[in-house]
A protein has these predicted regions:
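Positively charged, low-complexity intrinsically disordered leader regions
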Residues: 1-52
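Glycine-rich phosphate/dinucleotide-binding loop and adjoining beta-alpha-beta core of small-molecule
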Residues: 2-12, 52-191
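Single conserved hydrophobic/aromatic residue that forms the stacking wall/gate
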Residues: 195-197
Length: 197
């Protein structure tokens, strides 16, 4: 291949991604909600343009964890619901804080969440046409066990849905590209920066 086609891409690890986010918030004065909204809009725009505009009746289920990745998921749900799509949210059911909590409360003004574990949540995940993984983002480094493991296994049981991860598939280490007990394999990963994983 001709050298002019080669492009050096710098890969971001967990520490550098957190430093960039901190710089944007603290040094540049960009509110965390704005960063979350931009991430969510990017996911919603991509899904609308590439997957949903030709299938407007698709059942979309967004699985939201307790951290910032879950906040991205709630914001994505709200944006897609505003566009008229059938959106269902499965929530980790744990208390959220900060911007994630604000996006959870905003979503609750537009739609309903089903808390996991719940029979309805499992059924929603298994019957979805599009599954969005917003459970864990870049922050997880320990093995996934307990209810979260069960949740990801149910997510994985739907073999026919289009599966999209926000930032990185849950259960994959950002820095080491290894699976942390269990992972959510996806068709597409939507991220703002290339990562080592």
């Amino acid at each position: 291949m001709d050298a002019k086609f080669h492009k050096l891409i710098r890969l971001a690890d967990t520490i550098s991604m957190r430093e960039m986010e901190k710089h944007a918030i603290e040094d540049l004065g960009i509110h965390g909600l704005v960063l979350m909204e931009n991430a969510a809009r990017s996911v919603a725009d991509w899904l609308t343009e590439n997957k949903l505009k030709n299938n407007p009746g698709a059942r979309v289920v967004i699985c939201c964890g307790k951290g910032n990745n879950g906040g991205d998921g709630f914001a994505t749900a709200r944006l897609l619901a505003n566009r008229g799509y059938d959106i269902q949210v499965v929530d980790a059911g744990e208390v959220k804080k900060g911007d994630s909590r604000k996006n959870q409360l905003l979503w609750e003004k537009f739609g309903e969440s089903t808390t996991f574990p719940d029979v309805n949540a499992s059924l929603m995940i298994k019957e979805a046409d599009v599954l969005i993984d917003a459970i864990f983002g870049i922050g997880i480094e320990q093995s996934i066990e307990g209810a979260y493991r069960e949740w990801i296994e149910i997510f994985n049981s739907n073999k026919t849905a289009l599966r999209v991860a926000v930032d990185i598939p849950s259960g994959v280490s950002t820095d080491e590209s290894k699976i942390l007990g269990v992972a959510a394999p996806v068709s597409y990963t939507h991220l703002t920066l290339p990562t080592k994983a």
